[in-house]
């Protein structure tokens, strides 16, 4: 099974509503590697690495988000394996500081 890496940027009401915690929880349930962080422009950015089916599923879940969020736009692009190095040592999935 090959690993794919995707980076997403999510816009809408996605900060201050538990969106990052939702993404981290969903990613861990799907056994994905990566990270999630807020951006100063009000969006949320995430990187996911894992089997194609699981990555597609997490992106679908990101489009929905938690009930308190309202996603208006999700941009997806290929990600870099090197970007996984941003995770905290020893963690498969990390919530990173705001960028």
From Swiss-Prot:
The keyword Hydrolase applies. GO terms for molecular function: acylphosphatase activity. The active site is at 20, 38. Its EC number is 3.6.1.7. It comes from the Bacteria. It is an enzyme of class 3 (hydrolase). Residues 5-97 form the Acylphosphatase-like domain. The keyword NADP does not apply. InterPro entries: Acylphosphatase (IPR020456), Acylphosphatase-like_dom (IPR001792), Acylphosphatase-like_dom_sf (IPR036046), Acylphosphatase_CS (IPR017968). Pfam families: Acylphosphatase (PF00708). It catalyses: an acyl phosphate + H2O = a carboxylate + phosphate + H(+). Keywords: Hydrolase. Belongs to the acylphosphatase family. This is Acylphosphatase. It comes from Rhodopseudomonas palustris (strain BisB18).
């Amino acid at each position: 099974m090959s690993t794919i890496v995707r980076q997403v940027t999510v816009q809408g009401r996605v900060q201050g509503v538990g969106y990052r915690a939702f993404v981290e929880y969903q990613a861990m349930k799907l056994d994905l590697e990566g990270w999630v962080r807020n951006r100063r422009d009000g969006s949320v950015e995430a990187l996911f690495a894992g089997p194609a089916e699981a990555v597609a599923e997490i992106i679908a879940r990101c489009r929905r988000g938690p009930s308190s969020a309202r996603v208006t736009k999700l941009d997806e692009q290929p990600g870099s394996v090197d970007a996984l190095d941003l995770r905290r040592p020893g963690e498969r999935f990390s919530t990173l500081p705001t960028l």
